[in-house]
């Protein structure tokens, strides 16, 4: 049947080869590329005023206009007045100060500054001009720009917190903070040697940020602290690490607790 956006998969794919893609595709013994269409589909989205910006992990970035509620979302790069807007990303969110659109793992501007490369830079953090989702060209007359995480090989996820945005790579935790002109944002390494088990694993609560890594639970209240856990072995000895990106953290306000849904070893 016809569709506008590929639905993706409901399981995470570690590698490709036998059993990947459609029957008969590729030659015997060859691998196939993992794209957003044949990978676990994880959407991120955030409100930009009354509008919505959304992005399937590793896919295109979309903008939905609330005032035209009967129309479909369009690609961010097709937005009226769009200038060098990213075409791909791992996650989208809005900054806590000044309403900048932030794309984690955006495709960078090409060498001639005539467009985007169309290839994700997994450590790049790109941000738009203040309160302007269409303007992404870094100029002295605006506040658009980009920063790159130095530790790790890819950004796992990010979460807006109080006066900062936390960004996890596969080996480190960073803090993205608004610092004003001329740099707009500063990216500070908080802790190296920890990570995030999946993009939806962090939880924002009134008392701090909590998240699950592949070997433990952590809290952040200005510094990183491990959380003692009486069921640590029960959870991590029976964790399906191959489906780590399906982990989902949640806040239960009624009982003042946080928790995580995860795939067990037999699932």
Predicted regions, residues:
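A fold-level detector for beta-propeller and closely related beta-sheet-rich head/sensor domains
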Residues: 33, 55-58
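Solenoidal tandem-repeat scaffolds enriched in leucines and small polar residues
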Residues: 94-115, 119-120
């Amino acid at each position: 049947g016809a569709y506008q956006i590929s639905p993706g998969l409901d399981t995470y794919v570690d590698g490709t080869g036998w059993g990947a893609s459609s029957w008969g595709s590729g030659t015997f013994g060859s691998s196939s590329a993992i794209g957003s269409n044949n990978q676990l589909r994880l959407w991120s989205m955030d409100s930009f005023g009354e509008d919505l910006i959304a992005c399937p992990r590793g896919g295109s970035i979309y903008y939905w206009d609330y005032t035209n509620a009967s129309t479909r979302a369009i690609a961010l790069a097709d937005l009226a007045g769009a200038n060098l807007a990213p075409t791909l990303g791992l996650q989208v969110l809005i900054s806590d100060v000044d309403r900048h659109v932030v794309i984690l793992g955006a495709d960078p501007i090409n060498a001639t500054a005539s467009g985007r490369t169309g290839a994700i830079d997994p450590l790049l953090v790109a941000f738009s001009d203040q309160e302007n989702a269409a303007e992404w060209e870094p100029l002295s007359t605006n506040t658009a720009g980009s920063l790159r995480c130095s530790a790790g090989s890819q950004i796992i996820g990010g979460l807006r917190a109080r006066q900062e945005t936390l960004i996890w790579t596969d080996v480190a935790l960073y803090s993205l903070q608004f610092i004003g002109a001329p740099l707009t944002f500063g990216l500070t390494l908080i802790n190296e040697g920890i990570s995030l088990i999946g993009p939806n694993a962090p939880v924002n609560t009134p008392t701090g940020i909590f998240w699950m890594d592949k070997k433990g639970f952590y809290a952040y209240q200005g510094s990183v602290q491990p959380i003692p856990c009486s069921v640590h072995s029960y959870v991590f000895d029976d964790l399906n690490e191959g489906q780590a990106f399906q982990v989902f953290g949640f806040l239960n306000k009624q009982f003042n607790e946080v928790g995580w849904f995860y795939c067990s070893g037999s699932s």
